[in-house]
Amino acid sequence: MLDVILVSNYSMKEELEQSLKSNDYKFHDLMIQDINHIERYPIDDEYKTIIIQSANAIKKIDSSNNHIYNAKYIYGIGPNCRSWVQRKFSLDCIIPDHDYSSSGLIEKIKHDKYELGKTLLLKGIGGKTTIQNFLESENLDHNVCNVYERVLNEDNLHSVTAMIENGAVVIAFSKSSVEPLLHNSDINLDRLHFIVLDKSDEKIKCDKDVASMTKLVDIYDIPDIVEKIKAITK
């Protein structure tokens, strides 16, 4: 039976591990891109709208960063963002109805037709500029704050490289979380089964280059993830 390796940050990893182990799978939690948070108080002024480009951009913000409570609209790119906003600040976070991507969030903002007013975009260094470009194209009063950066965890990368020599199921919720594997010439991608979050504007790898590519709509549906792994490894 193939091992299952989680290479992304995931708030429900304990529940996933328990469910997989109850089905006799070996589970490994090995992030290969660590998140280094560089700003705990990025909300430095009053903003009518705050846009959160990824969950990592909100996780480490200090809950005493009071300006967030005065925002009229808080937008997030998907369920993980909404979960963290609710957990840390007990506030509502508007997300796309189904397309959890930069493009999907822009379409949601357009559909809502709110007057965004002064807007703050929270993102990571090297992250996509799709939303930033949209704000600029609309001539909206906005600031951009890079809250975190991704740092390669070489020890975990070496561990994963050795572990997947004979194949594995790799769970990754963003392209950035798995890029070190894709660019490693020592890895035979055709032995790897990837389970990824379905983002319409983010193609992680051509399907023909890997053993299989399975897309998730809801990363919090643990039974669905386990069933997909069973289908891959049967």
Label each region the model flagged.
Residues M1-K234:
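Signature of uroporphyrinogen-III synthase
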